Amino acid sequence: MTDDDRIKLEPSWKAALRAEFDQPYMHQLREFLRQEYAAGKEIYPPGPLIFNALNSTPLEQVKVVILGQDPYHGPGQAHGLCFSVQPGVPAPPSLVNIYKELQRDLNLPIPNHGYLQSWAEQGVLLLNTTMTVQRANAASHAKKGWEFFTDRIIQVVSEQCPNVVFLLWGAHAQSKQKLIDGTRHLVLKSVHPSPLSAYRGFFGCGHFSRANGFLQQHGMAPIDWSLPPL
C-alpha cells in the first residue's frame, strides 16, 4: 500500500469501492502504513497479498462470507485470506477446529495443509476486518482505518449480491451483523473456533451443510468444502 508498491485490485471490487480510496480514513491509513514500512517494520501479509481475498473472489461471485479479525502475525503464515495459511505452514489451532467441524458435519477428511485458496475461488470471501498486522504484534493495525474499509465491503456484498451466507464466528464477527440485510441473506452465528471457545457451540454448529443447503435452495451450486491435497 505504499506509493511505489501499487496494489492491484480486481475490477468488480475496484468499481464498487472506488469512492473509499478518496475518503479521509484511507489517506490516514496509507500514511500509517507508509510510516510502518519506512520504519523497517515487517508487515503481513506481503504487499501484493493484502487484497488477496478480494482478488480471489470477485464481487459478483460471492456466495459465502467468513469474517476473521486480523492476519496471522507469524512469518510466512498470512496471505490475505482469513483463517488460511500459506502452503507448507501447519494449520493453526482455529483452522484445525474448523476442519474437525467439517469432518463431523460433512464427513470430510482432515486436510494435510491450511491453504484455503480453493474456497476463495469458489465464492467464499475470506475477509479479515483488519487487513494488515505487524510481525509478532497481534491487533497492531486495528483501529487504523481498515475497519471502515471492510465494513463497506460487507455492506456492498449485502446490497449487491443475492442470497449470501454470512458465517459470523465469535463476538467480533457478530458485531458486523448490523451491516447485513438479514431479509436477503442467511446469517449463521456461533462462538469462535478457537480452542478457547470451540467446545461452547462451534463444534456441532453445522454451518457448512446449512450454507450449502441455502445455496442449493436458491439455485446455486454448493461449495466443495474439501480441500485438494498440496
UniProtKB/Swiss-Prot annotation:
Family: Belongs to the uracil-DNA glycosylase (UDG) superfamily. UNG family.
Any Pfam family hit: UDG
Source organism per UniProt: Pseudomonas entomophila (strain L48)
Gene Ontology terms, MF aspect: uracil DNA N-glycosylase activity
EC number: 3.2.2.27
Domain of life: Bacteria
Job of this protein: Excises uracil residues from the DNA which can arise as a result of misincorporation of dUMP residues by DNA polymerase or due to deamination of cytosine.
Protein name: Uracil-DNA glycosylase
Biological process, per Gene Ontology: base-excision repair, AP site formation via deaminated base removal
Entry annotated with the keyword Cytoplasm: yes
Top-level enzyme category: hydrolase
Any single GO CC term annotated in Swiss-Prot or TrEMBL for this entry: cytoplasm
Major subcellular location class: cytoplasm
Keyword Disulfide bond: no
Active-site residue numbers: D70 (proton acceptor)
Catalytic activity field: Hydrolyzes single-stranded DNA or mismatched double-stranded DNA and polynucleotides, releasing free uracil
UniProt keyword annotations, A-Z: Cytoplasm, DNA damage, DNA repair, Hydrolase
InterPro entries cross-referenced by the UniProt entry: UDG_fam1, Ura-DNA_Glyclase_AS, Uracil-DNA_glycosylase-like, Uracil-DNA_glycosylase-like_sf
Gene3D superfamilies: Uracil-DNA glycosylase-like domain
Location in or out of the cell: Cytoplasm
